[in-house]
Amino acid sequence: MGKNVVVLGTQWGDEGKGKIVDLLTEHATAVVRYQGGHNAGHTLVIDGEKTVLHLIPSGVLREGVQCLIGNGVVVAPDALLREIIKLEEKGIPVRERLRISPSCPLILSYHVALDQAREKARGEFKIGTTGRGIGPAYEDKVARRGLRIGDLFHRERFAAKLGELLDYHNFVLVNYYKEPAIDFQKTLDECMEYADLLKPLMLDVTAALHEMRRDGKDIMFEGAQGSLLDIDHGTYPYVTSSNTTAGGIATGSGFGPMYLDYILGITKAYTTRVGSGPFPTELFDDVGAFLAKRGHEFGATTGRARRCGWFDAVILRRAIEINSISGLCLTKLDVLDGLETINICVGYENEEGAVIDAPTDADSYLGLRPVYEQMPGWSESTLGAKTLEELPAAARAYIKRVEELVGAPIDIISTGPDRNETIVLRHPFG
């Protein structure tokens, strides 16, 4: 009987999901993306060679693994095709193994224009989006006016819908944001080119997943971004536009929650965030700079510097509950090597002096102060360790304390960027 495993982020994204998905796909028949778009950036390092993926599931680098994009993913055809070509130049037969749901909403040029115009208009109050049209595409979906990949294969119907959409969005772009209009004919011609290239990749992903389930195959679901960026459960409004939590699997792929066997939560040994929004443990001192430099904390998608801070057990406890986490993978432990002391946030103190749990919206974080528990650091290197016994005693104590504070076992520890630099204590597919 097969196992169905989920890998998702438990913080604000950039936790190191790509490496772990790649590691675990050795046991998987298929890897599935179920939400987000090309705002994700999953970095894989195999034998020292770095590959960054945005839309295509991380299983693409494992020979024979099928890669599926479910209906919950918003797809920018130009970005997808660029990614396919780049991988094919490395000798990876992407088109043989990649299949996409025709129900995926399309991201087109007017979505990008709207996204960037809004961020520009917000000025210092911008959300911090990637400017890639993700939010506007999801808005069109929810408003029931969006175009899907399947619409591309019906030219007349597609052209009529596109005309209506451009009338609507161009009115806003030109009259409200004072930006240039998007050209109808140019957009239509581009889309018809996409149609010819994408048609061979179409598949009823939901039906395929259930066929695999009945056949006893092992399936992995790959989350993008992190739980604290979830549109419903994140630090609203500084969130993404999709459900990044485990609930997004059912809606984004058609695979019901009762079929899931194990949910692996990826969490850094410290905390990072890209863009705007609350971040209680953020550091503005030498330690923050140390973490950023040692951890190479720059976004794989945008190149933006990530904000860095101490590990936050409060937000992780919330993420564990929301996602029904079975076990954790602690990544970038080696980045903490050399610190004399390490702080863990165990609570938030409000202006009245009361210690409270994680708020559910951004404004409620105002005035909160992190309550820290201090632990000894270690001077020895943890880089590349493959067993728990190889780690310094202080590092093992840190891991144990994190488990105690968050109420979940740490089943995997990542000690470096390469897939081999990993300690596996309990295998999700085991």
From Swiss-Prot:
Q: Cite a single GO MF annotation.
A: adenylosuccinate synthase activity
- PROSITE patterns named among the record's database cross-references: ADENYLOSUCCIN_SYN_1 (PS01266), ADENYLOSUCCIN_SYN_2 (PS00513)
From which source organism is this entry?
Pseudomonas savastanoi pv. phaseolicola (strain 1448A / Race 6) (Pseudomonas syringae pv. phaseolicola (strain 1448A / Race 6))
Q: Name one GO biological process term.
A: 'de novo' AMP biosynthetic process
- GO cellular component assignments: cytoplasm
Q: Function, please? A: Plays an important role in the de novo pathway of purine nucleotide biosynthesis. Catalyzes the first committed step in the biosynthesis of AMP from IMP.
Similarity section: Belongs to the adenylosuccinate synthetase family.
What reaction does this enzyme carry out catalytically? Answer: IMP + L-aspartate + GTP = N(6)-(1,2-dicarboxyethyl)-AMP + GDP + phosphate + 2 H(+)
Entry binding sites for GTP: 13-19, 41-43, 306, 332-334, 414-416
Its EC number(s): 6.3.4.4
Spell out the protein name for this chain.
Adenylosuccinate synthetase
The record lists IMP as bound by: D14, E15, G16, K17, N39, A40, G41, H42, T130, R144, Q225, T240, R304
Q: Where does substrate bind?
A: A300, T301, T302, G303, R304, A305, R306
Localization, UniProt: Cytoplasm
Q: How does it assemble?
A: Homodimer.
Give the cofactor note.
Answer: Binds 1 Mg(2+) ion per subunit.
- Work out whether the entry's keyword set contains Acetylation: no
The record's annotation in InterPro entries points to: Adenylosuccin_syn_GTP-bd, Adenylosuccin_syn_Lys_AS, Adenylosuccinate_synth_dom1, Adenylosuccinate_synth_dom2, Adenylosuccinate_synth_dom3, Adenylosuccinate_synthetase, P-loop_NTPase
Cofactor(s) the protein requires to work: Mg(2+)
Keywords recorded for this protein, A-Z: Cytoplasm, GTP-binding, Ligase, Magnesium, Metal-binding, Nucleotide-binding, Purine biosynthesis
Which HAMAP family does the UniProt record give? Adenylosucc_synth (MF_00011)
Query: Which pathway does the record list?
Result: Purine metabolism; AMP biosynthesis via de novo pathway; AMP from IMP: step 1/2
Q: Name one Pfam family in it.
A: Adenylsucc_synt
| Active-site residues (renumbered) | D14, H42
Where is Mg(2+) bound in this sequence? Answer: D14, G41
Q: Give yes or no: UniProt keyword GTP-binding.
A: yes
